[in-house]
Each structure stands twice: as structure tokens, then as C-alpha cells.
Amino acid sequence: MKSAWMEKTYTIDGCAFHTQHRKGSSGVTIVFEAGYGTSSETWKPLMADIDDEFGIFTYDRAGIGKSGQSRAKRTADQQVKELESLLKAADVKPPYLAVSHSYGAVITGLWACKNKHDIIGMVLLDPALGDCASFTFIPEEMHKSHTRKMMLEGTHAEFSKSLQELKKRQVHLGNMPLLVLSSGERTEKFAAEQEWQNLHSSILSLSNQSGWIQAKNSSHNIHHDEPHIVHLAIYDVWCAACQQAAPLYQAVN
């Protein structure tokens, strides 16, 4: 029997947050964190095919989708506090499996640094992680999206502060299974693409059990273009977390 979806609004520090949650038979809940200025609607096509053994928790960050505006600074540290408060309000207990896209990986990364014993694994989709603060190239597709959505979710200064917060507080994640998925469909020059890939490669050192997947037919929105790869990644991380010995993918396609 399929678990019922619960759609609720919780008020945290005066801001109303829209959430959706279902329970799973395994006790593990996948927590989805969307990219910059993007609502939780972005995950709907992917969630439709996730097995019922997994619980699912999604939400709209402040100022996005069906959530209200917040007077608090829109930094990753503040957003992690809000996520933790929402999980507590919704009575969604660990263990968690984190799946995040782009800037969402900054929030997930900081969350994992604070609560690595509650998170059994992470899947990062084209993450804005690593030494991103000193990154000289941002893919054109991401730059346009970032500029367009900036007014929805904070300022450039807050975005930069979030990257610095993570860099300052980054810790090694031990044996936490970690998969990084990089998009492969780029129009930029090779050197710039190589810099982006190197950024993602550097993230692998955060865990003793990490792997990399190149989604060769995907744009920045891998979960839209090749959702089957994301499904495989989630299941692979889950298996690795259960066994702490399962091999992780090195490449796809």
C-alpha cells in the first residue's frame, strides 16, 4: 500500500514554509534540496518513481514557491537551521538520505557537517560545491539562472557568504556514501568545462566512500533530463549505506 502524502505549512521564526512528506517502509527519508531560486516542484517527476521503501521530504525555501518571505538573512547557515526546524516540526526523524541540486548542495553540505551521524548518504547533482568561492568560471546556463533568480532568494553577498560558511566549516564525512553527478551537455569551451569537472572531482575527497557519475546527455538539470541516472544513484548510495562495502559508480554511459 502506498503511503499517503502529507502537505502542510509550518511557521518558523514568523515565516510560513510549505512542505510535502510521505513515510517509507525502511525508515529512511530522502530529503530533497532544490537549486537556487527553485521550488520543490522541480522534484515531482523524479519523486513519482521512487520506491515506497523510502520516505520523502520536500519543501520550498523562504521566498520560493508556496512559502512566505523571511526577514532573516538568506545564508546557508540560516537555511540549514530552517531545514532542521521543519524536520522537527514535521516529526521526520533520521536517518536521512540527502539529494540536492546546484546551490542546494551548499545547504546539504553544511547540514551534513553539522549532523553527519543523522545522514546516511548524499547524492549531489551538478553541485555548486568545492572551492566555488574562487571559481573563475560559471557555466552560462547557471549564470543566467542565478541572475534571474537572485531577486527571489537573497543577494549576491548572501550567496557568497554561504559559500564561505561551508568552506570554513567543512569537515571530512568519514565513510558516508557520496555520489557526485556532473552534467555532460555543455556548449562552453573545453577548458572551462574541465574547470567545472575539476571542481566536482575535488568534492570526492570529502568522503572515504565517494564516486562520480557523468550524465553525458544532461544539462544542468540532470534530474529533468536523465532521471533514471538519479534513481540509480539514490539506490546505490542507499545500498552502500546499508552494506558499507558496495561499490559506487565511476561513470554512466
From Swiss-Prot:
Alphabetical list of InterPro entries matching this protein: AB_hydrolase_1, AB_hydrolase_fold, AB_hydrolase_sf
Pfam family, one: Abhydrolase_1
Top-rank taxon: Bacteria
Protein name in the entry: Uncharacterized protein YqjL
Taxon lineage: Bacteria, Bacillati, Bacillota, Bacilli, Bacillales
Underlying gene: yqjL
